[in-house]
Amino acid sequence: MTRIIAGFAGSLSLAVPGYGTRPTSDRVREAIFSALEARAAIDGMRVLDLYSGSGALGLEAASRGAAHVTLVDRLAATSRDNATRVLKQAPKDAPPIVVTLGQPVQAFLVSARDSWDLVFMDPPYDFGLPEIEQNLEALASRLKPGAIVVLERSSRTPAQGWPAGISLERRKDYGDTALYWLAAG
């Protein structure tokens, strides 16, 4: 079962879509958020969660202090329901804004006008490198200076290049999961 790990909604269980998703494990999410908290990289930020599925990554960020979270997945019913449940736990004086959009990620990125401080990108493992590169190219101009992109892929995925405006900081493997920490600029 997927759950919010910490923050105002800590330990709240989240529903997981039943259409063949691969939710990010608690272990990997804990590693992501420990690294982000060490950088003081959550509080007050604008966060984008692409291929959000259950919305666990974006909603974890909301629970830990992100000001605005956008969840994007072509099938958004589960993330929308989870967002409603998480927001019921939010402090009444300063709740985060959570927007859930049900549309293909590439279509969203091409039409997006906002910019973000932190982006989670967890596409299906069977997505090819061309799709990922298209997403990153469309995203690059929407990143704020110093923005962080956390890309989750299979640890067996071949190496790839990065578009102009995005550079690899590091890669860390957790079993079958590889996290690519990317930086804007």
Q: For each of these PLM feature ranges, what is it?
A:
Residues 1-185:
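Class I S-adenosyl-L-methionine-dependent methyltransferase catalytic core
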